[in-house]
């Protein structure tokens, strides 16, 4: 099977999503699958292709949360590369730039989309609001999460009981 993993964070970044995606990639490859990965370039604002053409890094702009970078939701240069991969399934691991791009590509090319919901964002709202508007911010985040997760997913994976 030809699987495309789409994520905003990946090695060399150190966080739970990057680690989960890396472990999933290795496990799928061990089972004989061909795994491609689309992620944000953590170092430079440019495209790069690594691991014999199987990892595509997109340009991203820094945001003020951790070492996070946000990619375009429709990076034109990436489309032809991904089209050549002839993916059987797309598995997104983010609700932001690269995840939205995964949804668009899945719809555009008629590829089944699986999404893993890794982060309980309402538990992190206080880092951004600094205690102001916590209740309303949590409600907005809950709504946006439901909106995102209910749309265009063939399958939704929620790895914690709390998230159900």
What do these predicted regions represent?
Residues 1-59, 82:
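N-terminal subdomain of nucleotide-sugar transferases
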Residues 60, 114-147:
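Acceptor-binding helix/loop patch of EC 2.4 sugar-transfer enzymes
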Residues 45, 90-123:
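An aromatic- and histidine-rich active-site surface loop
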Residues 52-57, 108-110, 131-135:
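Short, hinge-like loop/turn segments at secondary-structure boundaries
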Residues 108, 137-155, 163-164:
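Membrane-proximal helix-turn-helix segments that form the acceptor-binding/catalytic region
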Residues 60, 64-89, 98-104, 108, ...:
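An amphipathic, basic-hydrophobic alpha-helix
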């Amino acid at each position: 099977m030809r699987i495309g993993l789409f994520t905003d964070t990946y090695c060399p970044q150190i966080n739970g999503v990057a680690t989960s995606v890396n472990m999933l990639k290795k496990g799928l490859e061990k089972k004989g699958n061909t795994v491609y990965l689309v992620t944000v370039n953590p170092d430079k604002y440019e495209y790069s292709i690594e691991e014999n053409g199987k990892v595509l890094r997109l340009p991203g702009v820094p945001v003020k949360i951790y070492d996070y970078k946000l990619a375009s939701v429709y990076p034109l240069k990436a489309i032809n590369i991904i089209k050549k991969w002839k993916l059987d399934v797309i598995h997104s691991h983010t609700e932001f730039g690269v995840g939205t791009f995964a949804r668009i590509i899945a719809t555009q090319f008629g590829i089944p989309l699986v999404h893993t919901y890794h982060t309980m964002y309402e538990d992190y709202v206080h880092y951004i609001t600094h205690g102001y508007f916590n209740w309303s911010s949590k409600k907005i985040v809950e709504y946006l999460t439901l909106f995102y997760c209910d749309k265009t997913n063939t399958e939704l994976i929620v790895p914690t009981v709390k998230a159900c």
